[in-house]
């Protein structure tokens, strides 16, 4: 993947004439679908086929299908999946049960995605939420302790990959301390590098063999005054070299 590679979205449930021409010319690395692009299984499959036909190759097509609040493929056409907090609760009762439940849930998600031509899922979430942080992560997380997050996230990755879907770990190097929603404002995380090394960074290092990672759109002031989405220095502080889509 080139440093200049891009993943593009589109305006609605089917390709417009102008989008088709633009995508053919731009030849993006992949595409991402949002709720505005999704109506029913037959429509999504036609759309993913059209996108690949437009660029002339079997490109990756991404979606955010975590379960809970973040689920682009929804009822009544698709199953409703639990949030990350459910696996956290199950893990507290029995580690094996929490891990197995996460695997099975994401294995089913993989089947749903592959059936409509989606081949990459922006999951699992590896962030460690803090009590004073914005609730944008909250129940999407697998826990507040790195050990359980790592265990559950490994199961999630296995479920997706065994179903033929590429996982995208997120939000590297940790969004759990952000005090604002990064979709609305730019969070600035001001704790020391040493603190991050002992906490937020741990899950991302443990899963650094993931095929892809999505960056957090935040400033980590111990490394740079620039948002990590634009800062190679901040990204390399984790020594993470896999492709990294920007959030």
For the regions a language model picked out, list residue spans one by one.
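Boundary/entry segment of secreted carbohydrate-active catalytic domains
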Residues: 1-14
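Short, well-ordered coil/turn segments that N-cap beta-strands
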Residues: 2-4, 57-59, 118-119, 163-165, ...
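Short, acidic/polar
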Residues: 13-22, 106-109
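Acidic (Asp/Glu)-rich catalytic clusters
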Residues: 22-25, 54-55, 207-208
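Enzymes and membrane/adaptor proteins characterized by extended Gly/Ser/Thr/Asp/Glu-rich
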Residues: 27-48, 54-148, 177-189, 216-225, ...
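Acidic, His- and aromatic-enriched active-site or binding-groove loops in soluble protein domains
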Residues: 140-159, 187-201
């Amino acid at each position: 993947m080139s440093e200049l590679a891009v993943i593009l979205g589109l305006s609605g449930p089917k390709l417009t004439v102008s989008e088709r021409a633009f995508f053919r010319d731009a030849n993006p690395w992949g595409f991402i679908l949002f709720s505005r692009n999704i109506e029913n299984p037959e429509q999504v499959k036609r759309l993913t086929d059209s996108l690949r036909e437009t660029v002339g190759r079997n490109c990756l097509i991404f979606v955010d299908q975590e379960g809970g609040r973040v689920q682009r493929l929804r009822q009544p056409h698709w199953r409703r999946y639990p949030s990350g907090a459910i696996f956290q609760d199950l893990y507290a009762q029995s580690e094996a049960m929490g891990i197995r439940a996460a695997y099975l849930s994401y294995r089913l998600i993989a089947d749903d995605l592959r059936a409509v031509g989606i081949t990459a899922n922006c999951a699992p979430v590896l962030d460690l939420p803090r009590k004073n942080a914005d609730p944008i992560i909250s129940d999407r997380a697998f826990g507040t302790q790195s050990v359980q997050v790592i265990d559950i996230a490994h199961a999630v990755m296995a479920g997706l990959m065994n179903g033929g879907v590429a996982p995208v770990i997120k939000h590297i190097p940790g969004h759990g301390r952000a005090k604002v929603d990064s979709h609305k404002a730019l969070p600035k995380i001001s704790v020391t590098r040493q603190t991050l090394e002992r906490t937020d960074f741990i899950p991302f290092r443990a899963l650094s063999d993931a095929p892809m990672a999505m960056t957090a759109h935040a400033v980590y002031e111990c490394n740079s005054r620039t948002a990590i989405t634009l800062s190679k220095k901040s990204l390399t502080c984790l020594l993470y070299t896999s492709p990294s889509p920007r959030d």
